Structures are given as structure tokens and as C-alpha cells.
């Protein structure tokens, strides 16, 4: 697990968005699993390379709030739920119910509108979309922002579980205790550049 830390305006989100193809970088190269993918940087292309992003603004960038949990989760893999030109509702529901149970999303059913969920459960739906898409590397941009203490603990546990299963995780956070407790390695950014790098083990906040 890697963590990027810096104050607001440090350029962390901008770097990630340029890597994922949301915005265009002025320069630089992107490598994924040792292969250069600089020319393949649209969100759809990066998703096809099993690279996922959980954006900081989940309500605007991560979810369709007026859609159900079911439709949000199945969106990235809609082709897998389609037979010719017909959408398989059965496959959709099987997938979304599996993710609801796996991530302990608190909602009466997967037909519940995502906008009716708590912040923590909305975050879980965004993560579920990435898992459904078979993501291998995921960037979590302020994943616990605006969620309650209980949901934070669940998100931390989920991150640990995913990392133990082999998923690569880069978390962007401005909360120092979160960074130190959830990291293997920490990168500090300022003005769009990495200024320091630390191994998390044995690190103190003063350092």
C-alpha cells in the first residue's frame, strides 16, 4: 500500500486525475505493471487496464445518485451483463447483491437509490463498482472524507482485506493519523511534485 500526503492544493488529486485520463498532463509518462500506457489515458482505457479510481467527490464523479445501487455497480461491466442487445437483469442483480453482501452495504435492497445512502455506504458502492470491474490497482482519493467513525473503520478494514488479496492501493489523504496507520510507504507532495518519501514502519508524526 502506498499513501500520498499533502495539504490541500499540493497537487495530489491533479496528478491522479491526469494519470487516469480525466485531465491532461503537460508532461510525463505513465507506466502500469512495467508497461508504458501514456497514450492510453482515457478513463475507459485505464479501466480496461484494471486501473480504478475512487474520486474525492464521490457524489459528482463516483456515483449516479438518482440511480439504484444495482445500476451503479453494474455500469462498469455492462457488457458482461448483456446478451446481444438485451440486458440480463438476473446477472445485474446477482452481481450487485454479491457486492452488497461482500461490502456490507446498508440498504433495504439493491434497488435503493444511491442518493438515499449515508456517506459511508455511498463510498462502499463506489468501491463495489471497482471490484465488479476486476480492478487490480486502485487510487482512493480521501476515501473517508465525510463518513462517520463506524464507516471509517469498515473502509480501513476493507482496504486491508483488498491489499492482502493482492490489490495495489494508493490512498490520497490529508489526515496524518490515517496516513501513518494505513501505509507501507508514504509520499509527501507539494506543488505537484513528490518532495519526501518515507517507510511508514516506525515513523513518527514529528518526522
Residue ranges and their predicted role:
Residues 1-207:
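Glycine-rich phosphate-binding loops of nucleotide-dependent enzymes
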Amino acid at each position: 500500500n502506498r499513501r500520498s500526503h499533502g495539504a490541500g492544493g499540493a497537487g495530489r488529486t491533479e496528478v491522479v486525475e491526469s494519470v487516469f485520463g480525466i485531465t491532461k498532463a503537460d508532461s510525463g509518462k505513465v507506466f502500469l505493471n512495467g508497461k508504458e500506457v501514456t497514450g492510453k489515458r482515457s478513463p475507459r482505457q485505464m479501466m480496461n487496464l484494471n486501473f480504478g479510481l475512487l474520486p474525492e467527490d464521490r457524489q459528482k464523479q463516483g456515483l449516479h445518485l438518482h440511480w439504484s445501487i444495482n445500476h451503479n455497480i453494474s455500469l462498469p461491466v455492462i457488457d458482461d451483463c448483456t446478451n446481444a442487445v438485451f440486458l440480463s437483469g438476473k446477472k445485474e442483480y446477482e452481481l450487485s447483491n454479491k457486492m452488497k453482501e461482500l461490502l456490507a452495504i446498508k440498504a433495504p435492497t439493491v434497488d435503493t437509490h444511491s442518493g438515499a445512502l449515508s456517506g459511508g455506504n455511498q463510498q462502499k458502492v463506489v468501491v463495489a463498482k471497482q471490484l465488479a470491474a476486476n480492478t487490480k490497482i486502485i487510487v482512493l482519493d480521501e476515501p473517508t472524507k465525510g463518513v462517520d467513525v463506524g464507516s471509517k473503520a469498515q473502509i480501513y478494514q476493507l482496504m486491508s482485506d483488498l491489499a492482502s488479496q493482492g490489490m495495489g492501493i494508493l490512498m490520497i489523504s490529508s489526515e496524518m493519523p490515517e496516513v501513518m496507520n494505513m501505509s507501507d510507504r508514504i509520499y509527501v507532495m507539494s506543488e505537484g511534485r513528490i518532495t519526501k518519501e518515507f517507510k511508514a514502519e516506525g515513523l513518527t508524526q514529528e518526522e
